[in-house]
């Protein structure tokens, strides 16, 4: 991945599939499906024999010095290791921050570190420096215009290729607040229906146990587009969730 830039998740996955695995990645956003998908692709590419060695580095659970020690330890056997560090802003000590930044500037090639920053509003000096040094991959839920291609991609992974636009629209309608929720709905439908069964919008509604939630930016977009009915729908949803 080129440094100091934003990379879209689809391009990042293609690069990993092509065998280009960087020693450090930064994932920015909170769509669990995209997070899991990218990590799975890295696992497959980084450990081709299937023997995955992955460790979670959580600042709230580990001593800061232990996190640095694990990253910088020299393995005499040069075995590959994958580390996933969530919420790097949890690293507080000045010395620890400096050592962490030094590592991501000069990482060990037999290790792969995936840093997850789920909050776009995190403006801490450490997070800014991390993004400036490594760049980042956007794993926020895509805008609605791009959701359709992801829905079809998920169905293809389930071996379902004959999916109508009406089915795609139904899924986005009920679960389009995140790819994670869409993936759950697709899993349910594909598990219940036989492989040769034609999936219909009625199937989506029948098996769905999810009611879509909306974000504030979607309300502002609907208002800007002068879409009254959608503005009212999203506004009611936001108010209902705020009052509960």
Regions found by a protein language model. Name each.
Residues 1-244:
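Conserved beta/loop motifs at nucleotide-recognition and modification sites
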């Amino acid at each position: 991945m080129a440094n100091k830039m934003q990379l879209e998740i689809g391009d990042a996955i293609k690069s990993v599939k092509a065998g280009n695995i960087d020693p450090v990645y930064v994932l920015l956003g909170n769509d669990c499906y995209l997070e899991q998908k990218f990590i799975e692709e890295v696992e497959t590419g980084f450990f081709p024999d299937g023997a995955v060695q992955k460790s979670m580095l959580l600042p709230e659970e580990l001593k800061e010095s232990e996190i640095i020690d694990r990253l910088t330890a020299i393995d005499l056997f040069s075995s590959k290791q994958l580390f996933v560090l969530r919420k790097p802003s949890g690293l507080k000590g000045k010395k620890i921050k400096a050592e962490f930044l030094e590592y991501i500037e000069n990482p060990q090639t037999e290790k792969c570190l995936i840093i997850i920053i789920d909050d776009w509003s995190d403006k801490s000096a450490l997070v800014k420096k991390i993004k400036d040094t490594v760049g980042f991959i956007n794993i926020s839920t895509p805008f609605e215009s791009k959701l359709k291609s992801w829905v079809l991609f998920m169905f293809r992974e389930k071996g379902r290729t004959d999916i109508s636009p009406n089915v795609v629209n139904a899924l986005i309608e009920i679960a389009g607040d995140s790819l994670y929720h869409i993936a759950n709905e697709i899993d349910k439908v594909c598990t219940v229906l036989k492989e040769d069964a034609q999936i219909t919008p009625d199937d989506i509604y029948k098996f769905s146990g999810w009611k879509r939630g909306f974000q504030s930016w979607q309300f502002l977009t609907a208002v800007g587009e002068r879409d009254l009915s959608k503005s009212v729908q999203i506004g009611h949803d936001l108010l209902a969730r705020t009052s509960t």
